[in-house]
């Protein structure tokens, strides 16, 4: 019985997440989620305080999935790099993928999650724990890179961890403009900052 209950809860979150990929958040209704999940209205209110609580939980799950992927990617780069040049070449490839213009929707999603937490203490705490986990993991990874001589020790590893996240999300300011910057030039600038300031 407990397994069935948990499955229903997960189905509601999964259905909500799938709809978030297809529709603007304001266009998603509880009835759309219930139909997609094959669940009843009473089951939704059994697991969640209200519709907003279900949305919050789904945002947290999606955020957590992105956090785990980000941690694995950066840890692999540092573990597999044997020289400083190998490290920065791998970092260049990562920059090219994370800064891809086609990932604008992902940046907008992250911005919505952060904005949603401003006046929602419960959601902010849940999101904050995951964000802390990401920053802590990146900090540890940066410390390893510093110990291996890939990055200099003139800055604290945590500062570097926050910096790399900031410019990744910061691309969003160009996503909404009509006259957009040159992608290659942007990636070149990031690579230069990484090598000349962080390296």
Each language-model region and where it sits:
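C-terminal alpha-helix
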Residues: 19, 141, 192-199
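Helix-turn-helix
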Residues: 11, 15, 19-61
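Hydrophobic/aromatic-rich alpha-helical bundle segments in the mid-to-C-terminal region
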Residues: 124-128, 132, 146-193
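Hydrophobic alpha-helical connector segments
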Residues: 57, 70-105, 157-164, 187
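Solvent-exposed, amphipathic alpha-helical segments
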Residues: 11, 15-23, 69-76, 109, ...
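N-terminal intrinsically disordered/low-complexity leader segments
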Residues: 1-7
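Short loop-to-helix capping motifs
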Residues: 50, 116-121
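Amphipathic alpha-helical packing segments from all-alpha helical-bundle domains
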Residues: 67-68, 72, 100-111, 119-148, ...
């Amino acid at each position: 019985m407990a397994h069935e209950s948990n499955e229903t809860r997960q189905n509601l979150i999964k259905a909500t997440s799938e709809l978030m990929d297809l529709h603007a958040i304001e266009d998603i209704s509880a009835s759309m989620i219930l139909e997609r999940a094959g669940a009843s209205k009473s089951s939704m209110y059994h697991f969640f305080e209200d519709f907003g609580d279900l949305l919050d939980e789904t945002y947290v799950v999606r955020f957590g999935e992105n956090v785990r992927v980000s941690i694995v990617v950066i840890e692999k780069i540092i573990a597999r790099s044997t020289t400083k040049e190998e490290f920065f070449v791998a970092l260049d490839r990562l920059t090219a993928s994370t800064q891809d213009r086609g990932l604008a929707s992902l940046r907008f999603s992250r911005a919505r999650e952060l904005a949603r937490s401003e006046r929602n203490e419960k959601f902010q705490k849940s999101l904050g724990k995951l964000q802390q986990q990401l920053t802590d993991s990146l900090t540890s990874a940066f410390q390893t890179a510093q110990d291996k001589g890939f990055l200099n020790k003139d800055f604290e590893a945590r500062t570097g961890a926050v910096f790399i996240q900031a410019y990744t999300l910061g691309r969003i300011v160009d996503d909404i403009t009509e006259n957009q910057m040159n992608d290659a030039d942007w990636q070149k600038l990031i690579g230069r900052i990484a090598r000349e300031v962080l390296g």
